[in-house]
Amino acid sequence: MPGIVLIGAQWGDEGKGKATDLIGTKVDYVARFNGGNNAGHSVVVGDESYALHLLPSGIINPNLTPVIGNGVVVDPEVLFEEIDGLESRGIDCSHLKVSEAAHIIAPYHRTLDKVTERFLGKHKIGTTGRGIGPAYADKINRVGIRVHDLFNADHLHDKVEASLHQKNQMLVKLYNRRPIDVDQTTEELLKLGERLKPYVANTGLILNKALDEGKTVLFEGAQATMLDVDHGTYPFVTSSNPTAGGACTGTGVGPTKITRVIGVSKAYVTRVGEGPFPTELLDESGEWLRQQGHEFGVTTGRPRRCGWFDAVVNRYASQVNGLTDIVLTKLDVLTGLKEIPICVAYDVDGERHDDMPTDQAAFAAAKPIYETMPGWDEDISDCHSFDELPATCQAYVKRLEELSGCRISVIGTGPQRDHVIQINSLVD
């Protein structure tokens, strides 16, 4: 009954696909539990690369069942675009299961997301403009539309009317926009519902039965720990819970069925969008990391902000998620550096902080306290055991493990699927 949670331990884009590749052939189900199409991930199979934003990575594998859980906000138009794109390349998507309780991103959510960001100006959050936040806001305000609402015309019309009552007032009076037509929106959603219906299921029941039967389920988180709406750098966060607890609330599976929690971290740190980032490099070192690591967003194409490894963040991620293992990715990017700084603590107004400040103003003011490790020049992409790594590289990894408070079980040594060192198995 292995329930394995896979999460990002930093600000996202950590390369969770490395871990998914290692685990994917050993699992029966892959379940997305949070977020929407605001997060991109790439799946490589042979010589083919697939860029996905909403579909679980398991969609490529016909031998397992991909699941979109109730904690995900689903944009049906984006979902169908991804399905059509995969099917045009010979990938069968008929085994996909979508939770009937998942909330829908309607066209008006995207509209509100974009106009609100423009209205906020310099105070903007830095969203992707894909309607994720407004859809989650409707969920919390109890005016959201769920997947099963798309199959009853009268019921759906009432839900859309209730949802747009206040939104149209805002669009007209605050944003100087035209109101959104209730009837037209209802018709559009009904048509989307017709196509979505074959994929819809009681996914909570399916996953619990699978675990009870001894099947292995991989719970796949979007975004990452530091973007969690409760535990991240609020308000510069996403609108859901990408931390391990979200795997339970976002799928309907109880915490006692989770046996492993795997956190993925880069050997340095990146972030996209607004918000504090203590180790950010605004000089040529940051640009060097960006170019060497090809740090540009899958979803937005935006250049990622880059910085040195932050052990305070990783310790926090280990604590919040209860990590059992760390997958360390992109270690090869650091090859060629004579010295590699590691942030071991923060200086906040002259006081040393070894742990994450709960006050975000303090975190924004935090200055990194660095410890410097010697680098290496050797190409590590062909190393397939820890002992094959250069001595200074081994020392760097061991220090990150010590500072993070969790064992490093897998190391990514290059961009290809086989550029990996597995120290401990990720599946019991």
UniProtKB/Swiss-Prot annotation:
SMART domains named in the record: Adenylsucc_synt
UniProt-annotated binding residues for substrate: 298-304
Swiss-Prot/TrEMBL keywords: Cytoplasm, GTP-binding, Ligase, Magnesium, Metal-binding, Nucleotide-binding, Purine biosynthesis
Record-annotated active site: 13 (proton acceptor), 41 (proton donor)
Location(s), subcellular: Cytoplasm
Major enzyme class: ligase
Main location: cytoplasm
Any one Gene Ontology cellular component term annotated for this protein: cytoplasm
Binding partners and assembly: Homodimer.
Protein name as annotated: Adenylosuccinate synthetase
Species in which this protein is naturally found: Bifidobacterium longum subsp. infantis (strain ATCC 15697 / DSM 20088 / JCM 1222 / NCTC 11817 / S12)
Lineage: Bacteria, Bacillati, Actinomycetota, Actinomycetes, Bifidobacteriales
